[in-house]
Amino acid sequence: MKAVRLTEVQHPLQLQNIPMPIIGENDVLVSIKAAGICHTDVHYRAGKSPVHPLPRTLGHEIAGTVEQVGKHATTYKVDDRVCVHYVLSCGTCYFCNTGNEQFCVQGSMIGRYADGGYAEYVSVPQRNLVSLPDEIPFEQGAILMCSSSTAFHALRKSRLQGGETVAIFGVGGLGISAVQLAYSFGALDVYAVDINADKLRLAEKYSAIPVNAMSNDPVAEIRSLTHGKGVDVAIEMIGFPQVMKQAVQSLAVMGRAVIVGISERPLEIDTYRELLGKEAEIIGTNDHLLQELPLLLELARRGKLKLSDAITHTVPLDADAINQALDNLENFSSDIRTVIVP
């Protein structure tokens, strides 16, 4: 089968012909109909986050149909529409038993430590599949598995209450989902912070209040818009320490900042003025949980989460096209999500 693979860090991905995956007794072979291209894959290609062993087929946002099932995989049948939960876990350790499988002691990840979705087929454990409703296109089902689910988990971690205000720093693939989901969680006002006017216009379409960080100090603008109070929840989705600091500085008394973006650099804050003095919190978040996916999919099925505008491009299973999409993400272009349609 065809697969676009990372063969060496800091080098373009390569199209290769590789053997079809072999499924185990509890596995399912999925025929990939759509695979999202995530900013995390930019980090993998650049060598900022380890991927091993190489070569590796990237891609952790996957939707498709069941092609074949293992002997003991009885939940799904051939041609069922499915999405793939990319966090591989043992199901028996302390973290799995407490519903925090992203910290599984034997944990792994599809598209990083196991071959992923930049291919025609992928083999996954049956327990990592969720049914994809007929109302949701494969392209949207794919990006629900990372960009939307990560946003959903971050909002849950924020403990957002009805009537509170939220600022989303970065309205790309994750942020445009976070804007919509925040209203589903009961937010009164959602402020969308970005430097890209196109992304801000899209966020405004979903009832966000735009804050252009290119032309204004976003912290001062949020303070002004909230009559000096600040926001109850700020979610940082870029991965720049400067933006993380702005998220913390924009908080109201007893506000919570959730850090989603990945950075290799430290975050420096005024500990008393920005944290202790107003009993603010900084919350880290990591991936998402399998138990969160059914509600997320139902919100999408009901039209509470609209993703058609979030998919700015589709590309074939072609190395040049995929590398170009990764380049665009690396350069923070206007693209929100590019999806591979094999």
Model-based region annotation:
Residues 134-216, 220:
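Mid-domain Rossmann-like dinucleotide-binding core that forms the NAD(H)/NADP(H) cofactor-binding site
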Residues 158, 201, 206-281:
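Glycine-rich cofactor phosphate-binding loops and adjacent beta1-alpha1 units
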Residues 21-35, 48-94, 133-136:
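Glycine-rich beta-strand-centered segment in the early N-terminal region that forms part
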Residues 90-169:
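NAD(P)H dinucleotide-binding glycine-rich loop of Rossmann-like/cofactor-binding domains
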Residues 196, 263, 288:
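Residues in the short beta-alpha loop(s) of Rossmann-like NAD(P)-binding domains
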Residues 245-249, 290-342:
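C-terminal hydrophobic helical "lid"/dimerization subdomain
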